[in-house]
Amino acid sequence: MENKPILSFEKVSIIYKKAPLLQNISFKVMAKENVCLLGKSGVGKSSLLNSVTNTKIVKSGLVYFDGVASNKKEYKKLKKQCSYLDQIPNLIDTDYVYEAILRSAKQKLTWLQKLICFEPKWIKDKILAILKEVNLNDYVSCIIKDLSAGQKQRVEIAKLFFKSPKLLLVDEPTTGLDPLTASKIMDLITDFVKREKITLVFVTHDIDLALKYSTRIIALKNHALVLDRLTEKLTKEQLYKIYDN
């Protein structure tokens, strides 16, 4: 079966605070690709990623998800098959780790099960298995606010395991993390998308992470797309040029 694009940008322009941020951006992401959006901080990488689920920031052009344009009514429903992992974990500080993941797990329950607060055994078993996979099995009863930044990001990744999206958008997931923890976080993400056959688009300014974890790199500079190439055909020296003034 022919591999079709799951995500497309067609002449997309984004304005931030009344000033042009990105202009005339066009590219396609094929199913099961690991695509990295690379560039300096403030170049518009995160805004472009955010435009997939928040189309209000798109001033001109169209975003397509699974072949449906962002100006169609079906797009709003379809984009629910897309998950977004932010650089700042979206967690409740007073939750226990188990509770935080249970909130995502409850999306799989019927309205009646939610109403009577029914928690099937399979959900509990899966949560415990997931916590073991992300190396948080010793933190089940820990409060979120007591976790390190890396551990909080692991909780966010664990929440994704219940969603099984078609497309995973990841915005600077290693911000503020040491290199070893950053690699472990990226290992978890890429192992997950490979196992579940999910398409990944992630944002970073880290050239080493881009080269290690992507199959394709798209670089942004001076409001434009300046590079789109398979990762295996790129060198670190070529990517450093993107950061030149």
Swiss-Prot record:
Record keywords: ATP-binding, Nucleotide-binding, Transport
Annotated ATP binding sites: G39, K40, S41, G42, V43, G44, K45, S46
Any one cellular-component term (Gene Ontology): ATP-binding cassette (ABC) transporter complex
Domain ABC transporter intervals: 7-245
UniProt key word Transport: yes
Pfam entry (one): ABC_tran
Molecular functions (GO terms): ATP binding; ATP hydrolysis activity; ATPase-coupled transmembrane transporter activity
Record function comment: Part of a high-affinity transport system.
Family listed: Belongs to the ABC transporter superfamily.
Name of protein: Probable ABC transporter ATP-binding protein p29
Source species of the chain: Mycoplasma genitalium (strain ATCC 33530 / DSM 19775 / NCTC 10195 / G37) (Mycoplasmoides genitalium)
